[in-house]
Every structure is written in structure tokens, then in C-alpha cells.
Amino acid sequence: RVLLTICLLLFPLTAIPLGGDQPAERMRNVRSAVQDPRFDSVGWCCPIQGCILGCTPCC
């Protein structure tokens, strides 16, 4: 228990970065997908060869 307490004091859980699915990051990914020249604005998708985060492959 002592070791756990020391570890939590030295490295609080808030210091651990969260996963990449945060709302602000999702919006940034969607914006970058829209600006990509391979983006199809009608289908809201891009070809599977040029897929980036926030962009759905056109199938």
C-alpha cells in the first residue's frame, strides 16, 4: 500500500494523457479531412487509399 500511495503522489492519474477520442480532437480531424483535396464533399468520404482520421472511406 505504501508503494501505491507513493506512486500516486508522484504520478497522479490526471497526468496520464487520455485516449485520442476527445471531442476537440474529433472536430480537428473532421476539419482536416474536409480540407484534404481527396475529400468527396457530396459523399462526406474519401477514397480508401487516402483515408485519414475523421474521414469515412467511400465504399
From Swiss-Prot:
Residues 1-15 form the signal peptide. Disulfide bonds join C45-C59, C46-C55, C51-C58. Keywords: Disulfide bond, Secreted, Signal, Toxin. One of its GO terms (molecular function) is toxin activity. Residues 16-44 form a propeptide. This is Conotoxin reg3.15. It comes from Conus regius. The cysteine framework is III (CC-C-C-CC). GO terms for cellular component: extracellular region. Belongs to the conotoxin M superfamily. The keyword Acetylation does not apply. Transmembrane segments: none annotated. Expressed by the venom duct.
